[in-house]
Amino acid sequence: MSITKDQILEALAAMSVMEVVELIEAMEEKFGVSAAAAVVSGGSDAAAAEEKTEFDVVLTSHGDNKVAVIKALRAATGLGLKEAKGMAESAPVAVKEAISKEEAEALKADLEAAGAAVEIK
């Protein structure tokens, strides 16, 4: 009679952490393997192929219409007048970080419509 996977899982669930560690060590010795994680050797192509999912919106300049930019900053971030003014005057500064591409593009459009220079990173 053979043991099923479910029976093995149930037996493991009933073990203490120390018993599981001892079991792993015994398996390493018996089969001549290591439980270390395998190293994936991917080039920079793999990183370039992944699409970026989080973006930062950076105000690079408030432009000629600082008042409109401050209003747009307040609407986008919920900051008070003093904080939004300080943000506009301390450009370049991150307006929002780790947001979706759609949200970043919408924020950039709003700020550019107010006269600001904006980058998405």
Curated annotation (Swiss-Prot):
The keyword Ribonucleoprotein applies. GO terms for molecular function: mRNA binding; structural constituent of ribosome. It comes from the Bacteria. GO terms for biological process: translation. Keywords: Ribonucleoprotein, Ribosomal protein. It holds the Pfam family Ribosomal_L12. One of its GO terms (cellular component) is cytosolic large ribosomal subunit. Homodimer. Part of the ribosomal stalk of the 50S ribosomal subunit. Forms a multimeric L10(L12)X complex, where L10 forms an elongated spine to which 2 to 4 L12 dimers bind in a sequential fashion. Binds GTP-bound translation factors. PANTHER family: 39S RIBOSOMAL PROTEIN L12, LARGE RIBOSOMAL SUBUNIT PROTEIN BL12M. HAMAP family: Ribosomal_bL12. NCBIfam families: L12. Forms part of the ribosomal stalk which helps the ribosome interact with GTP-bound translation factors. Is thus essential for accurate translation. Belongs to the bacterial ribosomal protein bL12 family. This is Large ribosomal subunit protein bL12. The gene is rplL.
